[in-house]
Amino acid sequence: MEKMYNVGKIVNTHGLIGEIRVIATTDFPEERFQVGNTVYLFEKNSKKPEKLIIRSHRKHKNFDLLMFEGLTGIHQVERMKEGVLKIKEAQLTDLEENEFYFHEIIGCTVVTTDGEELGEITEILTPGANDVWVVKGADKKEKLIPYIADVVKDINTNDKKITIEVMEGLLD
């Protein structure tokens, strides 16, 4: 089976007309959830994906609300709760130089310019102006690393290694 990537987790239904509430786990929700695009639903206890075509998309608070072609009522989408939406690898678009997909960054080892290993990136937060990488060290403590030029000095996705310059107070 072709490699697939998570783009969202379904957390609930919304209203009565077949909308679902999604927490996006993709770098580009506006692109991934465009009307007419295809996503694949993996229900909670299922290994077989269901192909879905997006009929509508809108933002509501911190969620993306989606509707799919052929599904017009809450009774048709309730089963999707706790499901995961994915796309096929072929649906990924080319990025500009020094741009990366989340899945390329998550799992990378972070080291300082002094050679100290800080841990592995386990999650990427998108609070606003810049992304923030969650790095879990051997001590199981999480460190937050901002993805800014002053901190991130080198990204090698082939070797899964990222080098950072530790600014004063960054790891306190």
Curated annotation (Swiss-Prot):
Example GO BP: rRNA processing
Domain PRC barrel intervals: 97-170
Keyword rRNA processing: yes
Intracellular or extracellular location(s): Cytoplasm
GO cellular component: cytoplasm; ribosome
GO molecular function list: ribosome binding
Function, in words: An accessory protein needed during the final step in the assembly of 30S ribosomal subunit, possibly for assembly of the head region. Essential for efficient processing of 16S rRNA. May be needed both before and after RbfA during the maturation of 16S rRNA. It has affinity for free ribosomal 30S subunits but not for 70S ribosomes.
Domain notes: The PRC barrel domain binds ribosomal protein uS19.
Name of protein: Ribosome maturation factor RimM
Source organism per UniProt: Listeria innocua serovar 6a (strain ATCC BAA-680 / CLIP 11262)
Name of the gene encoding the protein in the UniProt record: rimM
